[in-house]
Curated annotation (Swiss-Prot):
Phylogenetic classification of the source organism: Bacteria, Pseudomonadati, Pseudomonadota, Gammaproteobacteria, Lysobacterales
Gene that encodes it: purL
PROSITE patterns per the UniProt record, alphabetical: GATASE_TYPE_1
Source organism: Xanthomonas axonopodis pv. citri (strain 306)
Protein name, entry field: Phosphoribosylformylglycinamidine synthase
GO terms for MF: ATP binding; metal ion binding; phosphoribosylformylglycinamidine synthase activity
Cell compartment(s), UniProt: Cytoplasm
Length: 1348
């Protein structure tokens, strides 16, 4: 093992933060230093060049000196695992020609004052590392264990009379009737099952995978029910099948879209092209990943996002993920620096991450995966909820909801899968198998606390989004072949790993298969058959390809550097045979890292070839119907619970001034900015509405909108609805409200008909907890049989997670008492005390929870509505309430913020409900018609926090004050302001009052719609009623309450100085916001005369593995008159493409090699460490007739090639943002006078631009270099001054520098993303007088002019 030491691993503020936490345990403990350490295992008998390794890793051979009084600890990836960092870095170092098996990274932390006491050492260790993902070592030499390979695991046979014990030991979560079924089937086969067969059966038949409860028969309160839950959901599609192309039969549903043209490279020539305008389709899917997120929030949420992305990609014969959504429901946050009166102390489950950790780390994991894969996340929700119900029982989201969903494009001719034929190759596409995520399907199907802690760890997965990007590129290349797509049928690999995915692939086509485990790619030779077959290593797909197309498929994979293995063959006999060497060796050569197998014909395979286990039998040899045929069907016998006991909130004693502040500060209502700015929202170039709105960029959009293509203004919209706390009082109402809220949110988009809206329903419940099963049935029936059919809404896709409970004994980390009905609470519980007694059994149970995601095609996206109030004309705000005159407060946020920890909270009473479905239809049609008539200036739905929250948010977004008048809304100001009935607030011009009132009357909603407020220019919000002022707040006072959660979370998670700077700017009523200024006319196409000549210069759209911004880059160049070509670095390395054939190239944005060695460094290394490639680039830059553009990752890469770029010697390097966070913002740029060929005639302009990067802070070698560098773009504030304040300057670059050019202007690099906004509609906000062409299109047209 070689050990090299790198740069400092902790920034000053992170070091100080960690030291402060350590000193709460050991006051004398000090951190004296922290460094990255690289552990390298060379190939056997090989000696890597140490100087090259040091250059690539930016490391030193000698470690930093340790203080005399300090000792070192090493934080490394958990022993026995392979980190995502290692996967990508090892590939990069090998690609540079270095003979290594693996490189791994850890952190050396030097500490002075290390305690002698063992218990203190253990406590400190817990702060230094996360035992779910890391190990803590006492020396660098101990890291040798990272590379230890245990002896290969062996196959085990389980006696039929030992199935119950195996069920417990392996965490199979099998019911007794399933165990009896297995005993019967294997008894008939005359043999004992193998452990791998049992695990495969458990995964394939887990609640997570087979939805046994949703397919069960039911008896409720002694009465048999006619329909299963799933049958009631399917009823919605039966009643409204129109506009749905695929339902319940694939990884995602597919619905009709608008006419559009796909833009992608020609598979034969590589030239980008717009295809014919055809009716489009889009896939919709929403998943949850609750159990893994509860155990390890970052990887749990990351792989949740990754799994849903794969679902969209594996729809039909290949989809393309386009835009994502996310959501979290957790218990009280209990932020140490922001204590809240409604957050009572409570003992928490020691086996699960607390809510605060989940919300600090989980969203980062989900965002990081989306960012690196290259999918914008445009929508989300966040709920914090916790409520005492009785002794030892809390209704809460200790087991969180982690929602991951989205929509993807799919060609109409790719929607239907083709059945596999006998002889077809079974392929695993993607990364290698590792011992991670073992048993996740079964683990997520049981209550937390019912499985051993070691099984909790085993069920957590690890993420590698850059690998998933490569897989998607392969899928895209196959789909581009149209009817010649070699993929017949495929699935993503998720719960259960290959043991679920491959049998599903075969079963769905009515075939069997022979699978050779020896051909499965793995980075761990110690895996037993069970571990190899059942692990849930991520970023994998299984697919069927005809044998005759294997060579073609292999060439596509080789170009994308995407590993794959042909592991088996389909057979006519419906039998599954899995073993080692069950297929002839054939040709085992490969084109990607010696990992691709080519199969021989099926009839040469032997069922009983030798393989290396201690057992002479095959690991798996079963008829397919053992897995899919006649397993026992579940029956549920349920009874309704008694009436809820929570008292009703009495508003007479409340203070309105205080109530307003508390409601806005509740995390469910408060600003979600800290959850939004970490996620890229512009990648792909097709975003038309993200969360941020207006010149002041607040996250208040009601829905997300994407464009169907680059040449249309039509597209798709999606929204979320959820009102889960209401289910504790009325489960059916909660379900109706979720559907209603999804619709009121979606009304902000130009949706034309209700029947075009398709819903995804995600159901969560604590199955088996007293009364919950009956409430779940009520909720499903309420929307499946009643509401959705009445409104012509269908639910063609969904998911359930029915183990939403956690139980534990105080002081016993290993406790768990089964997945049955709720145990009787311990008699030792003291009802009035928040402090439990050791040994006491506690339980946390979530409400029945329905999350609705709504999707629909939309018309002209330029007619969308947002909560941004229009200023400059007399206007008024109207509230349209759908409660039928009722103002029900049961379950409201107002009730939650007045929880009393000495008694049951006053949460009860009648809840909001959708009493009349047709009233919602009338509302939808009113908003549609008013928008089409141009009557609506702004729109915001009413939800958590009531009309008061909606009005305040509109005021915040617009830097407006409000005069709110309640005279038309009753005598109780609390009910008027804080009821959460369905509805919306709209802004209309005062002169349009009569026209709007007439339209309201025509839709029979006159009694539902009244004026409620008037915008003012003063920084105050006033509420009046009954002829007097009831309350008045300063604008900043309310804003501070609303921003408090974001500020506190940012200070804990990010650079606290950055958090303070953003708060100061955000709360400034007089802040300028985005103030664009143009010195040119974007509609003037300066390239038109050159394009008219018919000459289109060739430009290479350059990408490396992990790059994801090539499509939008190509489109901009094509719009400007170029011929763009898709060029992968592998094309240049292998000589398929010659760089000299192009007049220019663009290095695109993304995460090349996952940015493992620093952003862009891996890409640059792949050029600089290959002499031929380095020479080719140097020759290209030396020519006077060429140009180059580097954006984001391409900018970072080109900055490291400055030694071979003439006139670039003063360029900086780009390092971690000052906030130490990925920053996705819309920032204001000034175009600086420079020689850049891209920016001619634009100097002096101030233009909003999309920013999305984690390492954009420019650092120059010296002040001389900074002064001499040719700056082309810089961040400014709304008044035109150079921006130094965060987030106006999102990365902390000196003087706001974010774009530079070479001395002759031919090579320009910039960190922001002008290529993502070729049209004004792509911008988060733009002035109303701008035309359709974005100012940034001028950059590309300037390049065309330069070419002549």
């Amino acid at each position: 093992m070689m050990v090299l030491e790198g740069a400092s691993a902790l920034s000053p503020f992170r070091r100080a933060r960690l030291e402060t936490r350590l000193q709460t345990l050991v006051p004398a403990l000090r951190i004296t230093g922290a460094w990255h350490v690289y552990f390298i295992r060379p190939e056997a008998g090989q000696s890597p060049d140490q100087a090259t390794l040091q250059r690539i890793l930016q490391a030193n051979a000698a470690p930093a000196e340790r203080d005399a009084d300090a000792s070192s600890r090493y934080v490394v990836p958990r022993l026995g695992t392979l980190s995502p960092w290692s996967s990508k870095a090892t590939e990069l170092v090998r690609g540079a020609g270095q003979p290594i098996q693996r490189v791994e990274r850890g952190t050396r932390i030097d500490l002075a004052g290390w305690p002698d006491d063992a218990s203190a050492q253990a406590a400190v260790a817990k702060l230094l590392h996360d035992p779910m993902t890391q190990s803590l070592l006492g020396s660098a030499a101990a890291a040798e264990a990272l590379f230890n390979v245990p002896d290969p695991g062996q196959l085990r046979r389980v006696p039929l009379d030992g199935l119950e014990q195996a069920n417990r030991d392996l965490g199979l979560a099998l019911a007794q009737d399933e165990i009896d079924y297995l005993r019967e089937r294997f008894g008939a086969l005359g043999r004992d099952p193998a452990d791998v067969e049992l695990m495969m059966f458990a995964q394939a038949n887990s609640e997570h995978c087979r939805h046994k409860i949703f397919n069960a028969t039911w008896t409720i309160d002694g009465k048999p029910q006619e329909r299963s839950l799933f049958r009631m959901i399917k009823h919605t599609h039966q009643q409204t099948p129109q506009h749905t192309l695929s339902a319940y039969s694939d990884n995602a549903a597919v619905v009709e879209g608008v006419p559009a043209a796909r833009y992608r490279p020609d598979p034969a020539t590589g030239q980008y092209r717009s295809e014919a305008v055809l009716p489009s389709a889009f896939a919709i899917k929403v998943e949850t990943h609750n159990h893994p997120t509860a155990i390890a929030p970052f990887p749990g949420a990351a792989t949740g996002a990754g799994g849903e992305i794969r679902d969209e990609g594996a729809t039909g014969r290949g989809g393309k993920p386009k835009a994502g959504l996310t959501g979290f429901s957790v218990s009280h946050l209990r932020i140490p620096t922001l204590p809240q009166p409604w957050e009572a102390p409570r003992a928490l489950n020691p086996r699960m991450a607390p809510a605060l950790d989940i919300m600090l780390d989980g969203p980062l994991g989900g965002a990081a995966f989306n960012n690196e894969f290259g999918r914008p996340n445009l929508l989300g929700y966040f709920r914090s909820f916790e409520l005492a119900e009785g002794p030892g029982l809390t209704r809460a989201y200790d087991k969180p909801i982690m929602l991951a969903g989205g929509l993807g494009a799919i060609d109409r001719n790719q929607v239907e899968k083709l059945r596999l034929q006998p002889g077809d190759a079974v392929i695993v596409l993607g990364g290698p198998a590792m011992l991670i995520g073992l048993g996740g399907g079964a683990a997520s199907s049981v209550a937390a606390g019912d499985s051993a802690e070691a099984l909790d760890f085993a069920s957590v997965q690890r993420e590698n989004p850059e690998m998933e990007r490569r897989c998607q590129e392969v899928i895209d290349r196959c789909v581009a072949l149209g009817v010649d797509n070699p993929i017949r049928w495929f699935h993503d690999v998720g719960a259960g790993g290959l043991s679920n995915a491959i049998p599903e692939l075969l079963h769905d086509s009515g075939v069997g298969g022979i699978i050779d485990l020896g051909r499965v790619l793995t980075d761990d030779p110690s895996l037993s058959p069970l571990e190899l077959w059942c692990n849930e290593s991520q970023e994998r797909y299984v697919l069927g390809v005809p044998q005759a197309r294997l060579e073609e498929f292999a060439a596509i994979c080789a170009r994308e550097r995407c590993p794959f293995a042909a592991v088996g063959v389909a057979t006519a006999e419906e039998r599954l045979v899995v073993g080692y060497g069950v297929l002839d060796a054939g040709n085992r050569e490969s084109g990607v890292g010696n990992r691709n197998g080519t199969l021989v014909a099926a009839d040469t395979a032997s069922h009983h070839s030798p393989f290396p286990t201690r057992d002479s039998q095959l690991p798996i040899d079963l008829p397919m119907d053992v897995l899919f045929g006649k397993a026992p069907k579940m029956h549920r016998d349920a009874a309704h619970p008694g009436a809820p006991q929570w008292p009703v909130l009495q508003t007479a004693s409340l203070d309105l001034q205080q109530a307003g502040l508390r409601v806005l500060a509740h995390p469910t209502v408060a600003s979600k900015s800290f959850l939004v700015t970490i996620g890229d929202r512009s990648v792909g170039g097709l975003t038309a509405r993200e969360q941020m709105i207006g010149p002041w960029q607040l996250p208040l959009a009601d829905c997300a909108i994407t464009l169907a293509g680059f040449d249309t203004f039509e597209g798709e919209a999606m929204s979320i609805g959820e009102r889960t706390p209401l289910a504790l009082l009325n489960a059916a109402a909660s379900a109706r409200m979720a559907v209603g809220e999804a619709i009121t949110n979606l009304c902000a988009a130009p949706v034309q008909t209700l029947d075009s809206i398709k819903l995804s329903a995600n159901w969560m419940a604590a199955a088996g907890h007293s009364g919950e099963d009956a409430l779940l049935y009520d909720a499903v029936r309420a929307i499946g049989m009643e509401l959705c059919p009445a409104l012509e809404l269908s639910v063609p896709v969904g998911k359930d997670s029915l183990s939403m409970q956690a139980q534990w004994q105080v002081g016993n980390r290993e406790s768990g008492i089964g997945n049955g009905e709720t145990p009787q609470p311990s008699a030792s519980t003291i009802p009035d005390s928040p402090f439990p007694i050791p040994g006491e059994t506690l339980k946390s149970v979530s409400p029945v929870s329905l999350i609705i995601s709504a999707f629909a095609p939309v018309g002209d996206v330029r007619t969308q509505l947002t909560p941004l109030l229009r200023s400059g004309e007399e206007s008024e705000l109207w509230l349209i309430g759908l409660g039928g005159g009722k103002q029900r407060l049961g379950g409201s946020v107002l009730a939650q913020v007045y929880a009393d920890d000495t008694a049951l909270p006053a949460f009860g009473g009648e809840v909001p409900d959708l009493d009349d479905a047709q009233r919602l239809r009338s509302f939808f049609e009113l908003i549609r018609d008013a928008r089409d008539s141009g009557l609506l200036l702004a729109y915001h739905d009413r939800s958590d926090g009531g009309a008061f929250a909606a009005l305040c948010e509109m005021a915040f977004a617009s830097r407006q004050g409000l005069d709110i008048t309640l005279d038309a809304w009753g005598d109780d100001a609390f009910r008027s302001l804080f009821n959460e009935e369905l509805g919306a607030v709209v802004q209309i011009a005062s002169e349009d009052r009569a026209a709007f009132a007439d339209l309201v009357e025509r839709h029979a909603l006159t009694e539902c719609a009244q004026r409620i407020a008037r915008p003012t220019g003063t920084p105050r919000i006033r509420v009046s009623g009954q002829g007097r002022v009831l309350a008045e707040w300063r604008w900043e006072e309310l804003f501070d309450a609303w921003w408090s959660v974001t500020h506190a979370m940012q200070k804990l998670r990010d650079n606290p100085d950055s958090a303070d700077e953003e708060r100061a700017l955000a709360r400034d009523f007089k802040a300028s916001g985005l103030r664009p200024k143009l010195v040119f006319d974007p509609s003037d196409d300066v390239a038109a005369p050159f394009v008219a000549t018919g000459t289109r210069p060739k430009v290479a759209i350059l990408r490396e593995q992990g790059v994801n911004g090539q499509i939008e880059m190509a489109y901009n160049f094509e719009r400007a008159g170029f011929r763009p070509y898709d060029v992968h670095m592998s094309d240049l390395i292998e000589g398929r493409v010659d760089l000299s054939a192009f007049v220019g190239f663009a290095a695109c944005g993304g995460f090349s090699y996952g940015d493992v060695l620093g952003a862009g460094r891996g890409w640059a290394t792949s050029i600089l460490e290959r002499s031929a490639l380095r020479d080719a680039f140097a020759a290209f830059f030396a020519r006077s007739d060429t140009f180059a553009l580097g954006v984001c990752n391409g900018c970072q890469m080109l900055s490291q090639l400055k030694d071979i770029i003439p006139g670039a010697e003063h360029w900086p390097r780009f390092l971690r943002n000052r906030s130490e966070q990925f920053e996705a913002r819309t920032a204001l740029l000034e175009v600086v006078e420079s020689p850049s060929i891209f920016l001619r005639g634009m100097a002096g302009s101030r233009i909003p631009v999309a920013v999305a990067h984690g390492e954009g802070r420019a650092e120059f070698d010296s002040a001389v270099d900074q002064a001499a560098a040719r700056v082309a773009l810089r961040y400014i504030d709304g008044d035109g001054a150079v921006a130094s304040q965060y987030p106006l300057n999102p990365n902390g670059s000196p003087d706001g520098i974010t774009g530079l050019t070479s001395s002759d202007g031919r090579v320009t690099i910039l960190m922001p993303h002008p290529e993502r906004t070729p049209r004004s509609a792509n911008l988060s906000w733009y002035p109303v007088d701008w035309g359709d062409d974005s100012p940034w299109l001028r950059m590309f047209r300037n390049a065309r002019v330069w070419c002549g």
